[in-house]
Amino acid sequence: MDWIDPLTTETRLPLIEICVEGIDGLLAAQAAGADRVELCASLVEGGITPSLGTVRAALDQATVPFHVMVRPRGGDFLYSETEYRSMLADVAALRDLGVPGVVFGCLNADGTIDEKRMGELTEAAGPLNVTCHRAFDMTRDPAEALEALIRCKVGRVLTSGQRDSAIEGLPLLADLVRQAGDRIIILGCGGLDLANIAEVRRKTGLAEMHFAALKDVPSTMRYRNPKVGMGGSDLDREYRNTLTDTPLVAATIAAAKA
């Protein structure tokens, strides 16, 4: 499939990207009217790299562009050399598979953008769309971090304005939109929902917005071994599946574009 950047079509702004976990999430988001999808695994960790099988399923079944998370683990964004090499390999493999875009972010220990690694990863991506994820929100100087990403030729940055929610981050989001101009796209995120997405759009001028409308659904497992868990102490978590809520996605998109 030849992927078209939605901003070059008749898409009604703001463009809406839905963050999903796995192929079922992608299918739910596109059915709800998403303009684009961010494809991840393990959203409980903030999103990590999905499996090869998931990516191939997305290539087979997606009808909207999707950008693939490249993040080898949860936690911070200061990666070892071996972790970084795995990211380079993932980006190259995703480029060769023909995905529309990739999402990654690397920081230095002092809270600045790791321009060397970000530049190399962006170069490895070749023609793919490149987004810096919310590693940006962990930088010490957002204005300088934005300029660093522009120098690295990154196409967009995902940010909540360095706060837990876009509502709290409104002033910085508006400043970043002004600073960015037409040099880089600011992709706003952070607790966006049916009640606040129109306000955030109006007060910031964001052309692109990102959210994950999720719901927990009980597992259909009938037998449950109460004596063992697969990690962590919350055994109930292992019998809850987090899914993209298609009606909520559709309603929130409608509110954003009203």
From Swiss-Prot:
A GO molecular function held by the record: copper ion binding
Keywords: Cytoplasm
PANTHER family: COPPER HOMEOSTASIS PROTEIN CUTC, COPPER HOMEOSTASIS PROTEIN CUTC HOMOLOG
GO cellular component: cytoplasm
Location of the protein in the cell: Cytoplasm
Family from the record: Belongs to the CutC family.
Protein name (record): PF03932 family protein CutC
UniProt organism field: Mesorhizobium japonicum (strain LMG 29417 / CECT 9101 / MAFF 303099)
Organism phylogeny: Bacteria, Pseudomonadati, Pseudomonadota, Alphaproteobacteria, Hyphomicrobiales
UniProt-listed InterPro entries: CutC-like (IPR005627), CutC-like_dom_sf (IPR036822)
Source taxon at top rank: Bacteria
